[in-house]
Every structure is written in C-alpha cells, then in structure tokens.
UniProtKB/Swiss-Prot annotation:
Belongs to the UPF0158 family. Pfam families: UPF0158. The lineage of its organism: Bacteria, Pseudomonadati, Chlamydiota, Chlamydiia, Chlamydiales. It comes from the Bacteria. This is UPF0158 protein CPn_0518/CP_0235/CPj0518/CpB0539.
Length: 324
C-alpha cells in the first residue's frame, strides 16, 4: 500500500468550489477530491488522449488517495426542486406553475429560467440551494472520513492561510502557525457535530426585510506542493467568491453564461414578435388593396372625399348668406 505525507492540520477546502464540482458532476464529467492536500481534479475529456491515459493510470495506481465526487442523479435534481417548491413557494399560482414545469421534459433548465424571472423567488432559491448543498457536501466529507475546514468559514488573514498551506506537512512551525493549527482543529470538530447537518433555526421574531447585500469572500492563493505530474493539467481551480456565481444549470458552467443565454432567448423572442407583426401588416396592406386603397396612410384609409364634402357644404352656406 502506498504511503503519503501526513497533513499536520485539517485540510483547507473551498466550499464554493466543492459546490460547483458537485453541481457539475454527472455521467459525462468526473471530479475527484484529493485526500492528501484537498485539491480537486476535473477529468476533462477534451484533453489530449496521452494526458488522459496518464491521469487514468494515476487514479488507478493511487485509488485510495482520490475520492470520486458523487454524481447528481435525475432523482436528486428533481427532489431538490420539489423540496424548494413545497417549502419556499407560498403564492398558489406561482407554485402551480413551478409544479407544472417540474413535469416537463427539460425541467431543470425551465425551472431556472422561471426562477430568474421572479426576483423574490430567486433570492430564496439561492439561499436554499447553498444551504442544502452545504449539508450534502459536509455529509459526504464525513462519510469519507475527511479532516477538513472550509476556508470561507475562517477569519484568518490571507498570509496566515497561505503559510498554513505552505507548511501543511511540516511538523515544526512558528508560534503563529501553531496557534492557527489549534484553531483549525477546534473548528474541524464543528463539522462533525449534529448541528452541522441539522442547522438550528434562529429563534425570536424574524428580522425586517432589507436590501440584500452580497459580500464576496476573501480567499488565499492555491498552494499545493504534492500534486503528481500527471494530475497537474486536470486541477479544478475556478475563482468563485460568491454563491450566486454557481449555477444549477446542467448546460452552462457559470451564471454569466446562463444569463447571457437568457438574454439571447429574449432577443430571439423579440425578433419573432417583430416578424409576426410584419406579416400581419403585409396581410392588412393586401386587404386594403383589394378594397380599393393604394396605401394604408391615414388620409387614404379614412377617405379624402369626406373632407371635400365638408368643404362644399361650408361653401354653399356662404352662398346662401350672399343671396339674402
């Protein structure tokens, strides 16, 4: 059995990056979490075949080192959407529309498109998705015996975080890093508590609704010193500092791509509407020609003859006044 370096403190994992990997993991995309340093591998099938052969050999020879991130099944996707609808949607008409979408062929994408058209529901969805994903990831990490802390949950300075990564396998370190390691060890225990999987609802009167202000998380640089040569080209290193950047979509990798597609769809719909209006205008013009009008101008369509009649009538009245 292969022996590996032993980390001197809990692994520093990025929950947002894990959420992204969990949402993208499917039948065509494999993600692995490393047990030694905590980096993520994405087996991109678009890489050269030689590189793919090397990474598959690495995964096979060191199977105990890499943990395959679970696939998001069709049932799980539907369950996530269904739970959100039943627990978070209160308007009857909106709920009925969501349930109708749930039964459609492309439910996942239609669900998101409808969500993004309703800002109030979008905020609830993003919060719900982050909370449920976090619980799912913690449960998976616990089941696979990872000793970890989420970097986004820490108040350490960037320098301390990077020093912890640089000296991850060093037994002897300075006082500052020793103290930081102790804090990490205490923090790691929280993820194995009952509350980590069953967060307690806050008691008391709910706070007044205020404008949502989303703050980006300050994170440290990626520092890995034990990445095998064959795995380096497959490191999964997206810079995600905000939960809203993670999309539930199976077609688009980022929220920006998804929103760009939505805007593109809107433009297509507008173009179709303009085309329909043009066709109706042409039909109306053809009909007017059959009725004896040369154009659809206001004067022609409503008749110039009426104006002539009015003019003659006014003239005849003046004539009668002169004869008297």
């Amino acid at each position: 059995m292969m022996t590996y370096p032993v980390p001197q403190n809990p692994l520093l994992l990025r929950i947002l990056r894990l959420m992204d990997a969990f949402s993208k993991s499917d039948d065509e995309r494999d993600f692995y979490l490393d047990r030694v340093e905590g980096f993520i591998l994405y087996i991109d099938l678009d890489k050269d075949q030689e590189d793919l052969n090397k990474i598959y050999q690495e995964l096979e020879e060191n199977a105990e080192r890499y943990c395959l991130i679970p696939k998001l099944t069709f049932y799980e996707v539907k369950k996530i959407m269904e739970t959100f609808i039943n627990e978070k949607i209160y308007d009857i008409d909106t709920k009925e529309k969501f349930l109708e979408i749930l039964q459609s062929k492309n439910a996942r994408e239609q669900f998101l498109e409808f969500i993004y058209d309703h800002e109030a529901e979008l905020e609830k969805w993003q919060q719900f998705y982050v909370e449920r994903s976090r619980i799912r990831i913690i449960e998976w990490l616990r089941n696979n015996k990872f000793h970890f802390v989420f970097e986004e949950d820490l108040d350490f300075t960037k320098n301390v975080l990077e020093q912890l990564k640089i000296h991850l396998f060093d037994a002897k370190v300075g006082k500052e890093i020793t103290q930081a390691r102790q804090l990490l060890s205490n923090k790691a225990k929280i993820y194995y508590s009952n509350e980590a999987l069953n967060p307690r609802p806050k008691r008391g009167r709910p706070p007044k609704q205020s404008a949502k202000v989303e703050t980006e998380t300050t994170i440290s640089s990626d520092i890995y010193t034990k990445v095998p040569q064959a795995a380096r080209r497959f490191l999964f290193l997206p810079e995600i500092t905000s939960p809203s950047s993670i999309t539930f979509s199976e077609k688009f990798d980022t929220e920006e791509e998804f929103l760009a597609n939505l805007r593109g769809s809107t433009r297509v719909e507008d173009q179709l509407n303009l085309t329909n209006l043009s066709e109706r205008f042409a039909s109306l013009k053809e009909l007017s020609a059959k009725l004896g009008y040369d154009s659809l101008s206001t004067g022609d369509f409503f008749g110039d003859d009426d104006e002539k009649v009015v003019t003659k009538t006014k003239g005849s009245k003046r004539g009668r006044k002169k004869s008297s």
